[in-house]
Amino acid sequence: MAPVPTHLRRIAAAAAVVALLDTANAAPYASPHGGHGVSLAAAEDLPRRIISLVPATTEMLFAMGAGDRIAGVSNYDRFPPETARLPKVGGLLDPDVERLLSLKPDLVIVYDTQADLKRQLERAQVPMFPYAHRGLADITETMRALGVRVGAKTAADAAAARVEQQLAAIGRRVAGRPRPKTLLVFGRELGALRRVTASGGYGFLHDVLELAGGADVLGDLRKQSVDMSAEMILARAPEVIIELHYGDAVKPENFDAERRVWDALPSVPAVRNKRVHLLDGSEFVVPGPRIVLAAERFARTLHPEVGRK
């Protein structure tokens, strides 16, 4: 089979992020230490072989000390490094049901939109934890609910509280500063201003941008993703453009070339004032404990005068 062109891989990656967003409407990751708080379920009923089809919940399980009970993960899990050795069972759009069932799970974390998979798991009498993500606050809410479900309530509550405290600290550092109008782009055809997809005024990306001291230039549109034309970008006149990259579609040495693509719109304030920023990292598209790192990087990009604390 011929290799897939890079620009098509980029489009596919952006489509996957849009699919993730559509499932709902300061420090890097650190695993907690200590024991597990047992939920109301009896200890013998707690899941011992968990399969997570959601990278965010995989990271949550590790954060609450339940990573040793994960029996399988999605093809898209990359963090923490321990996921590399775990069996892969497909993803949001292409779950491998046969492979999944062969691992004999006693709990499967699924996207709530995976209706066909949920029906098959129901027929197989496999317990499920449906996942639907919306805004920033849902990250810690999901962590706490998942902790109860797997019998790690105490550790999950502690991990969630740390995330909330770290996010609040970032918010305090940028409070009272001017909030630049920001366009947050998470999809674009490489080498051209085509197929531009940006964060609208709803969802965790919007929430993190606002917490980090930016004013979402599409904040009035209650959508998680917005397809942008050049005319729309010109009309919105963002003062800052942040473009997210993830995976291997763009090498760091090519960032300058991709940044120059925006020179096609010289009248846009962000372009004119050289405030187009390309950021790379899965923490921007995996709404789990590392969302703190995403918020930190947004804050330093939007407000470089504010040091990391």
Locations of regions flagged by a protein language model:
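Extracytoplasmic substrate-binding proteins
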Residues: 44-49, 116-193, 218-220, 271-309
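A short, structured surface patch at a secondary-structure boundary
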Residues: 48-103, 107-117, 217, 265
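Bacterial N-terminal signal peptides that target proteins for export
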Residues: 2-13
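Bacterial N-terminal signal peptides
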Residues: 12-23
